[in-house]
């Protein structure tokens, strides 16, 4: 007697392999996405909601929905427009000088010399010191009576009398920008140094054989290959500097006479000094839009330059 084995029909999986592979990829991204939503998206939505209400902490009885009232107040606030102008000076003055000096430092650190490893390590020192500590150090250096900067400039004959750097409306912004530049140079130096080390030496050797000089090699080899790093690093610094308030809070508190008051410090003062969270929310939303606009404009401009090349 012959036994016949009937093959069972192959069951089709409920989810195809392609869909499962896609779901696996999304599952890896889910924790980061949830973290991003919790730390970025939710605070932005809460700030937008807050900006639509009259929310003064010591006047709970006045809490009510006012729509765009805080934004209309912002448009009519002369201090806001002053802080916006100061923010532009603060951001672009700081980032431009940080980039130029950081690029120069990266080119120097790329060269071979005795003690190069030690110098590269020391270059990071301004960057790893907390911002509050940097502010306290430079506040002491700028001190008019016993500060090192005044004493040094008088000794070398560049000044005849002591200057109150942080108390002068004409000099305070330059002083805090210089401090921020000193702290931010290592960021660009290390980023660009990493890019320089990735450029193949064969390109420079071939260009030198063809008769290209130092400037030609820099312009046609170094700069184009470093452009992606420059774009990302500069955009990152623009965003960070727009939000960076530690130095100004410690060194000047936004003074004298709002000469160093930027939009981020003004927002914090409205929230935690005036306790006007509704107006602070409107300021934070506008600051976010300004940052996004400047970043988009910068990325659009740099992309246009790449396309023309």
Describe every region a protein language model picked out.
Residues 21-309:
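A structural signal for multi-pass alpha-helical bundles of membrane permease subunits
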Residues 1-19:
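Short, Lys/Arg-rich, polar N-terminal cytosolic tail immediately upstream
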């Amino acid at each position: 007697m012959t036994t016949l084995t009937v093959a069972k029909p192959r069951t089709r999986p409920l989810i195809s392999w392609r869909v499962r592979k896609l779901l696996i990829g999304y599952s890896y991204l889910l924790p980061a996405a949830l973290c991003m939503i919790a730390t970025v998206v939710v605070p932005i939505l809460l700030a937008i909601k807050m900006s639509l209400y009259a929310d003064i902490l010591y006047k709970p009885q006045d809490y009510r929905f006012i729509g765009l009232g805080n934004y209309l107040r912002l448009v009519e606030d002369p201090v806001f427009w002053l802080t916006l102008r100061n923010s532009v000076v603060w951001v672009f003055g700081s980032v431009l000088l940080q980039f130029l000096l950081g690029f120069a430092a990266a080119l120097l650190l790329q060269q071979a010399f005795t003690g190069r490893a030690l110098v590269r390590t020391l270059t990071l020192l301004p960057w790893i010191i907390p911002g509050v500590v940097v502010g306290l150090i430079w506040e002491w250096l700028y001190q008019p009576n016993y500060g090192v900067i005044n004493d040094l400039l008088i000794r070398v004959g560049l000044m005849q009398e002591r200057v109150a750097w942080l108390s002068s409306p004409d000099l305070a912004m330059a002083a805090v920008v210089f401090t921020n530049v000193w702290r931010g140079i290592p960021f660009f130096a290390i980023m660009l140094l990493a890019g320089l080390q990735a450029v193949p030496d064969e390109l420079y050797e071939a260009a030198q054989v063809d008769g290209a000089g130092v400037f030609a090699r820099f312009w046609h080899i170094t700069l184009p290959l470093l452009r992606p790093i420059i774009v990302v690093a500069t955009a990152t610094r623009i965003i960070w500097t727009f939000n960076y308030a530690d130095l100004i809070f410690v060194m000047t508190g936004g003074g004298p006479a709002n000469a160093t008051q930027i939009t981020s410090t003004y927002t914090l003062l409205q929230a935690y000094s005036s306790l006007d969270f509704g107006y602070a929310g409107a300021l934070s939303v506008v600051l976010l839009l300004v940052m996004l606009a400047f970043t988009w404009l910068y990325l659009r401009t740099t992309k246009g330059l790449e396309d023309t090349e």
